[in-house]
């Protein structure tokens, strides 16, 4: 269902920290023109943690409106309370979203049984396709392959965004899950290797800046042409790394403004503006990448 380059979309804000519709529309048009496969609206990169639930819902709905059927929209619906995750998911049931990305509960560090029961409860309360999201560096808990395998038996749990950066994970998960279960990288720097090992795509931060290039990398990889895929990816490696010098999405928003994709790189506290030293590294990376910006 979801393969190739999927962008973890930034949430553009004006100088007052309110959502900038003009910039959001420009970003969506950029991804449509670049043939990005889908948009994830309000995930980690979209600053879900600093938005109210009402804002969260409104931005996803605005993204759907502006996309107007031209590109699939996946709603971020994760929460560290199961009832809240279910409530948020149900709000999008008849909205037109193509599916949901649901991160493991953060901060409260549930057991594997707790994680299983959490996602089981979500699955049983919606018909929307669900993509699990494992990012232990952010959440403080790790969704292990054995638990993923148990969850893969639910018809609407269709895949996982695996963002540990541990390539051995893909082997372990592939051995345990059903054959049509989607394996999607959540780490740009290792995404191509992930795909060579059997992954179907990446939910990408880099695609905010290099949409065409990420689309081309994934397209080549899915065809088995890893020579051309690696040729492009080599140019982007500095960028993959520079975008995480500071916590995401600090660097990517600054760079999106720098290249004219958004009007302002405003973030909400506790996220703070990019450091001068990081700007230097980002400028170096963007020059090396030699991007084709629409």
UniProtKB/Swiss-Prot annotation:
Keywords for this entry? Amino-acid biosynthesis, Cytoplasm, Diaminopimelate biosynthesis, Lyase, Lysine biosynthesis, Schiff base
Q: Tell whether Amino-acid biosynthesis is among the UniProt keywords.
A: yes
Which reaction(s) does its UniProt entry say it catalyses?
L-aspartate 4-semialdehyde + pyruvate = (2S,4S)-4-hydroxy-2,3,4,5-tetrahydrodipicolinate + H2O + H(+)
TM ranges: none
Residues at site: Part of a proton relay during catalysis?
44, 107
Q: Any idea which positions bind pyruvate?
A: 45, 203
Q: What does this protein do?
A: Catalyzes the condensation of (S)-aspartate-beta-semialdehyde [(S)-ASA] and pyruvate to 4-hydroxy-tetrahydrodipicolinate (HTPA).
Describe its partners and assembly state. Answer: Homotetramer; dimer of dimers.
Q: Which family does it belong to?
A: Belongs to the DapA family.
* Protein name per UniProt: 4-hydroxy-tetrahydrodipicolinate synthase
Q: Quote the gene name from the UniProt entry.
A: dapA
């Amino acid at each position: 269902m979801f393969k190739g380059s999927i962008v973890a979309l930034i949430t553009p804000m004006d100088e007052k920290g309110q959502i900038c519709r003009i910039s959001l529309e420009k970003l969506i048009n950029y991804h449509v023109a670049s043939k990005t496969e889908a948009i994830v609206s309000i995930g980690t990169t979209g600053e879900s943690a600093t938005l109210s639930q009402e804002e969260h819902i409104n931005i996803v709905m605005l993204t759907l409106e502006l996309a107007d059927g031209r590109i699939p929209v996946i709603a971020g619906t994760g929460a560290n309370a199961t009832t809240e995750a279910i409530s948020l998911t149900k709000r999008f049931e008849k909205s037109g979203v193509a599916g949901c990305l649901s991160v493991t509960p953060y901060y409260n560090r549930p057991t594997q049984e707790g994680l299983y029961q959490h996602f089981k409860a979500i699955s049983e309360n919606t018909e929307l396709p669900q993509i699990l999201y494992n990012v232990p560096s952010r959440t403080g808990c790790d969704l292990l392959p054995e638990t993923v395998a148990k969850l893969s038996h639910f018809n609407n749990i269709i895949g996982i965004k695996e963002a540990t950066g541990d390539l051995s994970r893909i082997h372990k998960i592939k051995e345990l899950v059903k054959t049509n279960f989607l394996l999607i990288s959540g780490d740009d720097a290792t995404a191509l290797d992930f795909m060579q090992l059997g992954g179907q795509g990446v939910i990408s931060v880099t695609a905010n800046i290099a949409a065409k290039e990420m689309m081309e990398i994934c397209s080549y990889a899915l065809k088995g042409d890893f020579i051309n895929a690696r040729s492009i990816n080599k140019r982007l490696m500095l960028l993959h790394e520079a975008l995480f010098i500071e916590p995401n999405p600090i660097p990517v928003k600054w760079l999106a403004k720098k290249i004219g994709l958004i009007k302002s790189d405003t973030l909400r506290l506790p996220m703070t503006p990019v450091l001068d030293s990081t700007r230097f590294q980002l400028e170096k990376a963007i020059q090396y990448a030699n991007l084709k910006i629409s």
